[in-house]
Structures are given as C-alpha cells and as structure tokens.
C-alpha cells in the first residue's frame, strides 16, 4: 500500500486561520481527491505515475498536501464507467484554494515512469513541462471549515494523448482535465442495440446540451466525455455508463469510429449511428437505451 505523507507548512495554516475568522472556530476541513478516465480505444494501458498533490491557498504559498512514497503508478484505462481511484483524503486548513497540482513523473524516453501500451508495445508517455508544472487544475476549490470537499479529476484520454511527428515513438500527454464536485454529478447509462454496432470498439460520445454530434477536433461541439460500449457477459447486451456528469441536458451519440478519431483534425469519417438527449441528475443514474 502506498504511504501518504501530509505536510502542511505553519505559514499556510496561519494565513487560512485568519481568512476563516481566527482560531475561534473549526479552522480545518477534509479534502478527498480521486481520478477517473473517459474511454479511449487505441491503447491497451495508459500508465501515469503520480508523486504527490500540491494545493495553492488563495492567500499564502502553495504546499504539498501529499507526498507519495513510493510514487503511485496508475493505469487510467482501468478507471472507466464510473470507476475512480482515490489519490488523497487529507485534513487541510479550511478556505479557498486557487489551484490543485498533480505532481507526475513523465519524461521522454523513459517508459518506466509514465507510459502507453499499444498492440502489446510499451512507449514512453511524457508531459510537456511536466517536471516543472505537473498537471495543474486552476478552477479553484473551497474546503469548508469542519466539512468535507469531495472531488474527482476526469482525464479524457481521447483528447489528451498525441503522437508527435518526431520519429521518437514517444507519446505526449496534453491532459484535458475536468475537476468535478462529487456531490453535483450523476450518470447516464443504458444499452446499445447490437444492430447499431458496426465494430468491436464502439463508444458513446457525450455532448453538453442538445447539439448535433461531431468528432473530437478542438472546436465546438466537442464531447465533454465518452463511455466505452462493452458486452455484458451475463445479459449478452452491449452497455455503456457515462459517469461524472454535471446536472443538465446532454446529447449522447454512439460511434464505432472512435479509435480513428484524431483530436488534432476534423475527421469526416467519424459516423454516429444514433443520437438522443438525456438530462443528467446529481447523485442519480439516468437510463437511456439506443434501440436501433
């Protein structure tokens, strides 16, 4: 089991005590942070090595809330369909934080740190400026005094993994990250009729609002996430589970061309076999079946 060292500098605690009204009340709160992943079709495994988590208070210097010893190497492809893995569960000074930084070990030419496995071959996976900046989420969070802040970071690998044209064989990770409050998210799940599926690697793209589905190309509408369509061995049905959705309407569209969807270009060959609108509700799983 990985060991987590909590390291809170006195200066950060003092500054946040003042922000919370001094020492007359409860000046700490708990923060829980997990990671999950949206589907990607072309890889057998995507390993990211995390070495710690850093927080930046609104007032005061950043500090490492967790230092992993040894580092934690997590296969993000195992974290789909609502599955997540906890990174930290720690007590910190209550207050507002400007950003969260995930410290990662990901270097060019070194597949023993972070890596991607494709067709059985393992390739280095590196993050530009990863050693200096890590993976930073700048949306900001609030840890309530005497309360619990419970978040999940969603890695969308379909948008994040790129193969540069430098001949090295190293893959680059430019993460598309979503920081989600677990108390505010729900899921949409259901079946996809076998008659709609034209291949073995199909996914359901999820778009915010009522829109016409499009491929991943960096222009709106881009999916906020996607979910793999997998065969349920018990029922024989093809199922998907799109999790960690903020409450509101979404367009869901299955495609069996996701493996060829290049996030850097507009792929006219990505065909959606159906499209339906569903409304996600916090803390609920909404059912939506594609019947053909």
Feature map (PLM): residue ranges:
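A short, solvent-exposed, low-complexity linear motif enriched for acidic/polar residues
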Residues: 21-292
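Bacterial N-terminal signal peptides that target proteins for export
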Residues: 1-11
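C-terminal motif of bacterial Sec signal peptides marking the signal peptidase cleavage site
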Residues: 16-19
């Amino acid at each position: 089991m990985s060991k987590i060292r909590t390291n809170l500098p006195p200066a950060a605690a003092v500054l946040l005590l003042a922000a919370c009204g001094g020492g007359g009340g409860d000046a700490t709160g708990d923060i829980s942070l997990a990671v999950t992943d949206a589907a990607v079709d072309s890889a057998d495994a995507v390993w990211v090595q995390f070495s710690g988590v850093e927080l930046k208070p609104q007032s005061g210097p950043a500090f490492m809330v967790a230092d992993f010893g040894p580092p934690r190497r997590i296969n993000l492809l195992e974290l789909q369909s609502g599955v997540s893995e906890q990174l930290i569960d720690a007590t910190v000074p209550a207050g507002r934080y400007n950003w969260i930084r995930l410290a990662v070990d990901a270097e060019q030419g070194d597949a023993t740190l972070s890596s991607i496995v494709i067709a059985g071959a393992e390739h280095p996976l590196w993050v530009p400026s990863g050693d200096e900046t890590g993976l930073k989420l700048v949306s900001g969070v609030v840890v309530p005094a005497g309360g619990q802040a419970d978040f999940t970071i969603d890695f969308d690998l379909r948008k994040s993994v790129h193969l540069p044209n430098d001949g090295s064989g190293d893959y680059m990770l430019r993460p598309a990250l979503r920081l989600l409050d677990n108390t505010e998210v729900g899921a949409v799940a259901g079946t996809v009729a076998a008659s709609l599926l034209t291949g073995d690697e199909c996914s359901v793209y999820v778009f915010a609002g009522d829109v016409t589905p499009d491929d991943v190309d960096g222009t709106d509408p881009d999916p906020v996430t996607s979910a793999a369509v997998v065969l349920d061995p018990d029922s024989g049905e093809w199922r998907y589970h799109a999790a960690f959705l903020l409450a509101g309407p979404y367009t869901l569209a299955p495609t069996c061309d996701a493996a060829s969807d290049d996030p850097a270009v507009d792929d006219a060959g990505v065909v959606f076999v159906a499209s339906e609108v569903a409304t996600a509700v916090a803390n609920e799983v909404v059912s939506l079946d594609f019947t053909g």
